[in-house]
Amino acid sequence: MASRMGMVAIVSLFVCALVASTSVNANVWQTDEDAFYSTNKLGVNGNMEMAQQQSGFIGHRPRLASFNRASKQLDSEKRPVPSGPDPIHHSIPSHAPQHPPSYGKAPYEDDRSRASPGLSNPIGPPPFLDRY
C-alpha cells in the first residue's frame, strides 16, 4: 500500500512538473529577441508593436507610477501647510468659540439620575451647552 502511494505521488509530481514547463514555454514574452532592439521595425516602439501583434494586445500600456516631485521647489524648501480648519470646507460661525468647549462637570448631575431617570425624566442624549 505504501509503495502504491509513493508511486502515485511521484507520478503526480512528474505530471505537475510537465504541465508547469509547458505553460512557461507557451508564454509569448519568452522569445529569443532582444528586449530593446528590433531588426525588422524602425523606431523606438518597434518591439512594443511586435509584442502587441504577437499577443493580441490592443491599446497602450498603463504608465508606471512616477515618484518625481510635482512642484519645482528646491529639495531644501518645505511645502507650506495651512494651520487650522479650512474655511471653504468647514464654515465656522463668527459667534462660535475657536476652541472646543471643556466641561467642568459631567452633563448629568449624578449617577442616580442616569441609572433611574423615572417617568418624568426620559433617557436621551446628554445636553450640549455649546455647539459649533
UniProtKB/Swiss-Prot annotation:
An example GO BP is:
cell-cell signaling involved in cell fate commitment
Q: Which domain of life is it from?
A: Eukaryota
Carbohydrate attachment sites? P85
Report biased composition (Pro residues) as residue ranges.
123-132
Keyword Glycoprotein appears in the UniProt entry: yes
A Gene Ontology MF term for this entry? receptor serine/threonine kinase binding
Record key words, sorted: Developmental protein, Differentiation, Glycoprotein, Hydroxylation, Secreted, Signal
Secretion signal span: 1-26
Query: Which residues are recorded with the post-translational modification Hydroxyproline?
Result: P82, P85
Ranges for region Disordered: 68-132
A cellular component term, taken from the record's GO annotations: apoplast
Family stated for the protein in its record: Belongs to the CLV3/ESR signal peptide family.
Q: What is this protein called?
A: CLAVATA3/ESR (CLE)-related protein ESR2
Species source reads Zea mays
Write the lineage as a comma-separated list: Eukaryota, Viridiplantae, Streptophyta, Embryophyta, Tracheophyta
Task: Provide the gene name from the record.
Answer: ESR2
